[in-house]
Swiss-Prot record:
Pfam family, one: Helicase_C
Name by which UniProt lists this protein: ATP-dependent RNA helicase DBP2
Family annotation (CDD domains): DEADc_DDX5_DDX17, SF2_C_DEAD
InterPro entries for the chain: DEAD/DEAH_box_helicase_dom, Helicase_ATP-bd, Helicase_C-like, P-loop_NTPase, RNA-helicase_DEAD-box_CS, RNA_helicase_DEAD_Q_motif
Subcellular location: Cytoplasm; Nucleus
Organism from which the protein derives: Lodderomyces elongisporus (strain ATCC 11503 / CBS 2605 / JCM 1781 / NBRC 1676 / NRRL YB-4239)
Length: 552
């Protein structure tokens, strides 16, 4: 794979800082410290002083693509990889066998050999100590190959399933990268920029960055929509080495002059396929055009459709690629897939039946997918009235409520979460034992993505799907996915096989979900002795529905 990216000339460059930020102390890092500042003519303007409690002035400017002059830009270090003697000593046959065992395929030239342990990665002690403190037994497949790639300073593509350890694959090399750069000065933007499709994923990435960056005093902020801008603006003005952002809110900050990307030398596009599915391609391109072209760019994705390949060709320079598993669309073989062909009116009682079985184990967590926000609320209200500990999460919920719902679900205080696709994207909750497709998704890619929330990390899981005649065009693709995973296909579903309806599997963008259905007919008033509404200040709508007598 060879991507060509010729870059135009420029006459930009960094301006000098206006008064330095205090050093972070004790970072050590690669490449001999971070002493000198950037030279160059000083920036005019910069951030104006903010009087106590004063408002930020929001003067928007249209972003234009700079003309880059690489010769005038300050040099920076991005290759920190020194191969461990154990890695060097391995034969080509041993390396090939390791990659085969981990379903690892590579593409490109001069690709570093994979590592097999944390010590072989060559991380400094402050990173290794944190890894050991977190109790990770060994690197995942994507980390074994991704860390040497990222630490070598190369542009790279990493393709692996959600939940495979991609976040640490770029987070830890990013921390090493930061510690080798000069300190931020007043008015500087971040050094590492991570773009993510959803606020939930962005917040999860921030958690990992905070955890592993604390010992180096690396600051970060999370910039996303649906939350007040003030705290995000203050973080950016105070200076952060890492900015994790959703594309839309970051564009707002850039156009309002609240930050800049002149210092970014390490760019991450996480869940690139999902960002394109959600229509963020214009924003991504506008953002990346603001970053110096000799940066290091890392693209991470669960799939490799043509749209993502085109983005890689445009913005990655001679990249190397690692893929864990097959590029063919497939479901994990650790997931038991159960598909029931039903009518709309049968769904509610069948859901309760499956919940009774699933929650017989008190450690179970059940994620239920609904196609619309309305259905999501209706399912949740019914379940709560019937005594089930369910909470809803969707796009109409305020961010603080979404955070609370996720916390309750993660901790097991509420073992059922009902979600829409958009709300669930980027959510990584450990220990989900069951996924229920109350409504089928609009395309087979989303089906595989949904059920992949269970059966992670070698654990087993169960996916239950209610299939109606409205989804008959999905039948052939669904049979193909189940057949590949060696699942039992019910005769009722086989009637919808591709032999009758044709295959609709695509590897590009999804086709969008079905429109919402009308509401249920009500079922008389729940079971007596309701428990009152949700917790004050957090819950709204269906999440405040009284909880009936416990079903278990």
């Amino acid at each position: 794979m060879s991507y060509n990216g010729g870059y135009g000339q420029n006459n930009g460059g960094y301006g000098g800082g206006q008064g330095g930020y205090g050093g972070r102390g004790g970072a050590g890092g690669y490449g001999g410290g971070r002493g000198g500042g950037y030279g160059g003519g000083g920036r005019s303007g910069g951030y104006g002083g903010r009087g106590g409690g004063g408002r930020f002035q929001d003067t928007r400017v249209e972003l234009t693509t700079p003309e880059w002059d690489l010769e005038s830009l300050p040099k920076f270090e991005k290759n920190f990889y020194n191969e461990h003697p154990n890695v060097t000593a391995r034969t080509d046959r041993e390396i090939e066998q390791f990659r085969k065992e981990n379903e690892m395929s590579i593409l490109g030239h001069d690709i570093p050999h994979p590592i097999t342990s944390f010590d072989e990665a060559g991380f400094p002690d402050y990173v290794l100590n944190e890894l050991k403190n977190q109790g990770f037994p060994k690197p995942t497949g994507i980390q074994c190959q991704g860390w040497p790639m990222a630490l070598s300073g190369r542009d790279m593509v990493g393709i692996a399933a959600t939940g495979s350890g991609k976040t640490l694959s770029y987070c830890l090399p990013g921390i090493v990268h930061i510690n080798a750069q000069p300190l931020l000065k007043r008015g500087d933007g971040p050094i590492v920029l991570v773009l993510a499709p959803t606020r939930e994923l962005a917040c999860q990435i921030q958690t990992e960055c905070s955890k592993f960056g604390a010992s180096s005093r690396i600051r970060n902020t999370c910039v996303y929509g649906g939350a007040p801008k003030g705290p995000q603006i203050r973080d950016l003005a105070n200076g952060v080495e890492i900015c994790i952002a959703t594309p839309g809110r970051l564009i707002d900050m850039l156009e309002a002059g609240k930050t800049n990307l002149k210092r970014v030398t390490y760019l991450v596009l996480d869940e690139a396929d999902r960002m394109l599915d959600m229509g963020f391609e214009p924003q991504i391109r506008k953002i990346v055009d603001q970053i110096r072209p000799d940066r290091q760019t890392l693209m991470w994705s669960a799939t490799w459709p043509k749209e993502v390949q085109n983005l890689a060709r445009d913005y990655l320079d001679n990249p190397i690629q690692v893929t864990i598993g097959s590029l063919e669309l497939a479901a994990s073989h650790t997931i038991t897939q159960i598909v029931q062909v039903v009518t709309e009116y049968q769904k509610r009682d069948l859901l309760v039946k499956h919940l009774e079985s699933a929650l017989a184990d008190s450690n179970s967590k059940v994620l239920v997918f609904a196609s619309t926000k309305r259905t999501c609320d209706e399912v949740t209200s019914y379940l709560r009235a019937d005594g089930w500990p369910a909470l809803a999460i969707h796009g109409d919920k305020e961010q603080h409520e979404r955070d609370w719902v996720l916390k309750e679900f993660r901790q097991g205080s509420h073992s059922i979460m009902v979600a829409t696709d958009v709300a669930a994207r980027g959510i990584d909750v450990k220990g989900i034992t069951h996924v229920v497709n109350y409504d089928m998704p609009g395309n087979i890619e989303d089906y595989v993505h949904r059920i992949g929330r269970t059966g992670r990390g070698g654990a087993t899981g169960t996916a239950i799907s209610f299939f109606t005649d409205n989804e008959k065009k999905l039948g052939g693709d669904l049979c193909k996915i189940m057949r590949e995973a060696k699942q039992t296909i019910p005769p009722e579903l086989q009637a919808y096989d591709r032999r009758s309806y044709g295959s609709h599997i695509r590897y590009g963008r999804g086709r969008g979900g079905r429109g919402g259905r009308g509401g249920w007919g009500g079922r008389g008033g729940g079971r007596g002795g309701g428990r009152g509404g949700g917790r004050g200040g957090y819950s709204s709508g269906s999440n405040t529905a009284p909880l009936g007598n416990r079903r278990f």
